[in-house]
C-alpha cells in the first residue's frame, strides 16, 4: 500500500485497451477477473475496498456506500445501468454465489484474493493480452477511471476538480500526474494555441 502523499508507480490503460482486456477475459472464461476489473474501474475503489466488497453490496443496486479502508471516509457510489447489468450477468455465469461472499474470492476457501496474488495475475494478463502498459497493477483501474473521465469531459478544468474530490488528493497537480497528464500532454495543450499570420489576417 502506498504511503499518504506518495503516488503509485502504476500506469493507466487507454480505454480501448481496457475494453479489449474485458473482452479477452470474458472470451477466456476468466469471469472473476472480468468482474474484478469491471468493478475496480467503475467504482474507482482501491484494491483493499474492492476485496472487501460483497455481492450483497452491489448486486442489483443503483448505488451503495463504502467505507474506505485507507481514509476511513464513507463514499457514496452510483452505478450505471450497464454496470449493474454486467455485475448481474457475471453473478449468474459464476453460479450465483452466496451473496455474503466477497465478489473477488477463491471458490474453495471463499476468502478474498490477496493484493499480491491479484498483482501477479495482472502482470500475466499484461503479456497475454498484449496491453500497452509498463506498470500494470491493481491501481491501474483507478487511474484508468480518472483518465477516462478527463478525456471524456468537455470542460477539462471541471473534470480535474471533480477527480480531485473523488481521489481526495491534496492538489490539482497531484491529480494531473496521477492520471498521466505529464509534461508532454501539457506541452501539446500549449502548442495547440495558434495565431494567424499578419498576411492571413489581412487577407481575411
Tell what function each PLM region has.
Residues 1-12, 194-204:
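C-terminal secondary-structure termini that scaffold catalytic or DNA-interacting sites
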Residues 2, 15-42, 155:
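Basic, Lys/Arg- and aromatic-enriched nucleic-acid-binding interface segment
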Residues 18, 82-133:
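Active-site/catalytic core of tyrosine-dependent DNA strand-transfer enzymes
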Residues 32, 133-152:
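Short basic/aromatic active-site micro-motif
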Residues 49-51, 146, 154-168:
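Active-site-proximal segment of tyrosine recombinases
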Residues 52-85:
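Conserved tyrosine-mediated DNA breakage-rejoining catalytic core shared by Y-recombinases
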Residues 68-72, 167-192:
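Catalytic-site neighborhood detector that most strongly recognizes the C-terminal catalytic loop/helix
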Residues 82, 156, 180-204:
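DNA/chromatin major-groove-contacting recognition/catalytic segments
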Amino acid at each position: 500500500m502506498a504511503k499518504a502523499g506518495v503516488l503509485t508507480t502504476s500506469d493507466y490503460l487507454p480505454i480501448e485497451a481496457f475494453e479489449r482486456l474485458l473482452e479477452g477475459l470474458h472470451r477466456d472464461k476468466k469471469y472473476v477477473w472480468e468482474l474484478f476489473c469491471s468493478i475496480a474501474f467503475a467504482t474507482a475503489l482501491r484494491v483493499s475496498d474492492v476485496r472487501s466488497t460483497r455481492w450483497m453490496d452491489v448486486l442489483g443496486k443503483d448505488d451503495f456506500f463504502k467505507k474506505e479502508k485507507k481514509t476511513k471516509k464513507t463514499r457514496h457510489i452510483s452505478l450505471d445501468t450497464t454496470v449493474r447489468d454486467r455485475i448481474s450477468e457475471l453473478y449468474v455465469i459464476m453460479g450465483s454465489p452466496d451473496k455474503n461472499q466477497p465478489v473477488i474470492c477463491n471458490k474453495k476457501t471463499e476468502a478474498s484474493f490477496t493484493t499480491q496474488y491479484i498483482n501477479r495475475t495482472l502482470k500475466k494478463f499484461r503479456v497475454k493480452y498484449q496491453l500497452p502498459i509498463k506498470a500494470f497493477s491493481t491501481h491501474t483501474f483507478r487511474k484508468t477511471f480518472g483518465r477516462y473521465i478527463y478525456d471524456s469531459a468537455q470542460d477539462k478544468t471541471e473534470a480535474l476538480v471533480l477527480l480531485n474530490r473523488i481521489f481526495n488528493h491534496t492538489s490539482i497537480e497531484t491529480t494531473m500526474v496521477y492520471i498521466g497528464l505529464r509534461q508532454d500532454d501539457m506541452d501539446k495543450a500549449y502548442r495547440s494555441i495558434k495565431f494567424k499570420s499578419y498576411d492571413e489576417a489581412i487577407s481575411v
